[in-house]
């Protein structure tokens, strides 16, 4: 179940998040066509098929764009057949998208991260339709920093009943959402009093990114914060 935190899956999910970065050579505009090559390699080595990326992985980024990568494969679990969909959201080497990090909006959730969330959901629905996926699905989504907040908000929307299309079904137990160093993009009103324990936030309290947008401005994260050890802990050496 996605509600159970698993260290092995957390380590794989960090790999998924890193693989979703634009490749280092994409810093040069003439190399953008292959900027998703790390995700392709990761997905192929994990046995996935139907490996696709949205246009922003291979075009110059804009302020409110976001890179999205998807892959899928058929698996069997608990005696049943599912399509496992892996979603890696770009969280580094995204150039102009830095501007979207500062788009808080006048009220409510973080406007820039919400735009990213909506793009991920739209692309995921299109991916499911274009690849002909039907029936029960398991969704594995991961992101780092900016894209961790986006993945976090995607998980929150799905837990709240957002549909991925009439031809597929997703149980909350089949959502595996791992977010690394996520900023806070949701509001306290959205997350309080509800259960989002299939969303796992791996947080280093020494990272300033995890404190924005600010708690004092009523921002929050979906899910469970899992704080990594720091030298400030009394039992750090243990």
What are these regions (language model features)?
Residues 60-62, 91-93, 145, 179-184, ...:
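Short, flexible loop/turn elements at secondary-structure junctions
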Residues 40-142, 157-174, 193-196:
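A conserved cap/lid and substrate-binding interface adjacent to the catalytic center
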Residues 30-34, 102-109, 221:
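Short, polar loop/linker segments at the starts of domains and inter-domain junctions
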Residues 152-156:
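Short, hydrophobic alpha-helix immediately C-terminal to the catalytic nucleophile
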Residues 1-60:
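N-terminal low-complexity, Ser/Thr- and acidic-residue-enriched intrinsically disordered segments
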Residues 167-238:
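The feature captures the conserved acid-bearing segment of alpha/beta-hydrolase catalytic domains
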Residues 143-147, 151:
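Gly/Ala-rich beta-loop-alpha elbow adjacent to hydrolase catalytic centers
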């Amino acid at each position: 179940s996605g509600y159970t935190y698993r260290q092995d899956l957390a380590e794989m999910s960090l790999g998924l998040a890193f693989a979703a970065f634009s490749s280092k050579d994409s810093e040069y505009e003439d190399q953008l066509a292959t900027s998703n090559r790390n995700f392709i390699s990761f997905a192929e080595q994990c046995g996935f098929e139907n490996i696709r990326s949205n246009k922003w992985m291979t075009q110059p980024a804009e302020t409110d764009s976001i890179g999205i990568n998807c892959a899928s494969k058929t698996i069997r679990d608990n005696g049943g057949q599912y399509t496992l969909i892996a979603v890696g959201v770009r969280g580094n080497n995204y150039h102009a998208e830095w501007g979207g990090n500062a788009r808080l909006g006048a009220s409510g959730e973080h406007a820039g991260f919400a735009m990213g969330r909506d793009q991920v959901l739209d692309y995921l629905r299109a991916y499911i339709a274009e690849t002909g996926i039907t029936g029960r699905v398991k969704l594995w989504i991961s992101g780092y920093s900016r894209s961790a907040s986006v993945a976090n908000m995607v998980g929150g929307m799905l837990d709240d009943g957002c549909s991925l299309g009439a031809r597929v079904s997703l149980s909350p137990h089949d959502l595996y959402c791992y977010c690394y160093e996520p900023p806070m993009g949701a509001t306290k009103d959205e997350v309080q009093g509800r259960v989002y324990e299939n969303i796992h936030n791996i947080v280093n309290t020494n990272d300033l990114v995890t404190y924005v947008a600010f708690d004092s401005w009523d921002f929050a994260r979906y899910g469970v914060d899992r704080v990594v050890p720091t030298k400030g802990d009394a039992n750090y050496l243990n």
